[in-house]
Amino acid sequence: MTNGSPGWVELSSTKFYPKTSKILQKIKVISARGLCEKKYPGDIRQWKNMAFKSALDSIHDINRNIPTNIICFGDSIIEMEASYNLKEYFSNAYLKTIKFKESPTHTELEKELKIISTQLDSIMANSDKNLSIKVTRKKNE
């Protein structure tokens, strides 16, 4: 889910991260801007909220009464807020948010992804708990 224009994620990954681009071909990338910009011009928060809700609605066989983990990775508080708003659609939801640095360099993004990828098992091991992780810059960076 991106607030970028349709195709932006695919184009950027092809240019900067060709190996990642191949993986992304197997994942549905949704442009919140593409879905919602006409209805909510300039309201990027609403784009993300409505796109998250639309993605949830597209899962027809989901049981909203069983314990559910909502996991959000993003570099903006907007994703964190939109994922929090999804909790209201479940009777028993646990939210796990991983907020990356805003506007990271390529090197910083690679470090963030490597760190989180090594911790995914422990993040998911706490399936019955909420969790919030915020990646920040060191003071001297």
What does each of the following model-derived ranges do?
Residues 7-141:
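C-terminal cap/substrate-recognition subdomain and adjoining C-terminal extension
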